[in-house]
Swiss-Prot record:
PROSITE patterns named among the record's database cross-references: RIBOSOMAL_L22 (PS00464)
One Gene Ontology molecular-function label: rRNA binding
Keyword flag Transit peptide: no
Native source species: Lysinibacillus sphaericus (strain C3-41)
Highest taxon of the lineage: Bacteria
Protein name: Large ribosomal subunit protein uL22
Family per similarity comment: Belongs to the universal ribosomal protein uL22 family.
Length: 114
């Protein structure tokens, strides 16, 4: 089975927030997945939609796959490098703020007949 992949690296959204969105489209057909992402009011939705469109374009251009038969076969989010920042607090102290990043990997493949 031929599959096409797209990866977005170091996206400035925390992985646990992106996972909420990618869990909605796992196993869905591409058209349905795009519709779900368009109607999901989360900051990660447009980013995941862009990765999905990239994977579909890769499938069409690199592997000559039929875009109507594609499904989101695999999608996962890994943690990227963390940006460490400090927030001033009372009494001259400072608290660490971790600004987390994500690596989003999305794989589309042709749906099996039957």
């Amino acid at each position: 089975m031929t599959q096409a992949k797209a990866i977005a690296r170091t996206v400035r959204i925390a992985p646990r927030k992106v996972r909420l969105v990618v869990d909605l489209i796992r196993g869905k057909q591409v058209g349905e997945a795009v519709a779900i992402l368009r109607h999901t009011p989360k900051a990660a939705s447009p980013v995941v939609e862009k990765v999905l469109k990239s994977a579909v374009a890769n499938a069409e251009h690199n592997y000559d796959l039929d875009i109507n038969s594609l499904v989101v076969s695999e999608v996962f989010v890994d943690e990227g490098p963390t940006l460490k920042r400090f927030r001033p607090r009372a009494q001259g102290r400072a608290s660490a703020i971790n600004k987390r990043t994500s690596h989003i990997t999305l794989v589309v493949s042709e749906k099996k007949e039957g």
